[in-house]
Amino acid sequence: MGITEKACAWFESYLTGRSFSVPWLGQSSTVHHLATRVSQGSALGPLLFAIYTTSLGEITGSHGFSYHCYADDTQLYLSFPPDDHTFSARISNCLSDISKWMKSYNLQLNLSKTELLVIPAKPSIQHNISIQIDFLSLAPSKAVRNLGVVIDERLTFKDHVASVACSCCFALYNIRKIRPYLTQHATQLLVQSTVISHLDYCNAHLTDLPACTVRPLQMVQNAAARLVFNHPKGAHVTPLFIELHWLPLAARIKFKLLTLAYKVRDGTAPIYLNPLAKDYVSARPLRSSQDCRLAVPTPRSGQSRLFSCIVPQMWNDLPSTPRIGASFSIFKKLLKTLLFREHLLN
């Protein structure tokens, strides 16, 4: 890993000499020394675990899988044609090798929390999958949770919308009970931190979904605005949004996507987004060449919601002022003003 001298000594001092005891009824058990592991909840723990499991990529790569790791959560990805009948065996063999590797590293593959999601290329395609590992069977799930986002096999995100709406409604219910004791400003801060933040989390996945699918989330935002001002259920929300300087849900999603597009052009976006939004290069000199436009690919059937298709269109539809020569902070201010006028003042 290239860690030497003082840095290596610092890691060694962090990992060695640890012990623990259990308090019970005012007394503590005998102190036991830890030969492995560090204190649970340590800030450095996830990073050290990622370093410890670096060789996992060699195993997944040998079976043709890509993978992501987030602390102790590992996700494997495999793309295969519909007529491939060997993918079940490939998945089983890969999981079996991972289980053996974990045992050699004093780890354990938790099969009770292992989930399988198959996303077919077309809704009409059905896959009969049965994964066997360590005498246990693993069947495909209709939906799985990925860092708080519920992803279903059809990518409709209906389950995710229902989950977010449920958690937000519960938060609003609790705030409503203490609303008589809160000022308007305190209520606004509480709603923004416990409700609006949930609506904004990973909302880019909701791009171009049917209005009926995302309507529950918009209703949650409407209820949140009414709660801030302590207005009745039927109160009109547009004046409330204007006073709160809140963008409605559709505009918030568009704001998130366009800020990501700016970061892609600025080189500050995650690496995996860079190939999805490329600058438009004309075959001949044009006056529009200085407008900082993005290349719009021709989408295939069923791919109109792809980031690489919808974001360049949104970016090119912006006026030239936000797109050209603005810093990120200025771009966000101009973009919010533009969306505010488009969705609330017209």
Residue ranges, per PLM feature:
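Hydrophobic/basic alpha-helical segments
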Residues: 1-346
